[in-house]
Amino acid sequence: MLEPQRQVIQSYGDGGFKISGLDHAGSVIVTALKTQSWNLASIAEIDVKEFCGKVKSLGELNVLLLGTGTSTLAPNPKLGANLQNLGISLEIMDTGAACRTFNVLVAEERLIAAALIPT
C-alpha cells in the first residue's frame, strides 16, 4: 500500500506558499497529509473559538506552529490556553521559522500542524 504524500513546504513569500509542488496564495493550515486555505490576513483577525474548532477538526495533533508573518507577534492569550485544553502545544514564531520547523517535524513523523500567515 502506498503512503499518502507528505506535505513539504518548499518556499514562501510574495503573499503565498509552495507546498508539495502546488502554489497557495494567502494564509494556509498545513498538516503532514494536507494543506487547506485559511482566510486570514493578520494575527489580529484570529477568532479564538473558530480557530480552535478548525484545529480540532484536523485530527490528532500534539503541536501547532503559528507562523505570524515576517516577525513574531503574540496572538490573543486565550488561544494558547484553549489549545492547551485540547492537548495541543502552541508554538509561535515568524513564518519562515515555522515553515522550516514544520518540515523537520513532519520528517520525524510528529503529530503537527502549521497555521501560516504569508510574508
Feature-to-residue mapping (PLM):
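Mid-chain, well-packed structural core segment of small domains
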Residues: K54-I92
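N-terminal, charge-rich interaction modules
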Residues: M1-L40
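Compact, glycine-rich, soluble single-domain proteins
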Residues: T31-L58
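Short glycine-rich anion-binding loops that position phosphate/pyrophosphate groups of nucleotides
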Residues: T35, G69-S71, P118-T119
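Short acidic loop-to-helix transition motifs that present clustered carboxylates
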Residues: T95-R100
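Conserved phosphate-binding catalytic cores of ATP/NTP-utilizing and phosphoryl-transfer enzymes
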Residues: T101-E108
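A polyampholytic, Gly/Pro-enriched intrinsically disordered region
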Residues: E108-T119
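Short glycine-/small-residue-rich flexible loop motifs, especially phosphate/cofactor-binding loops
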Residues: D14, G80, F102
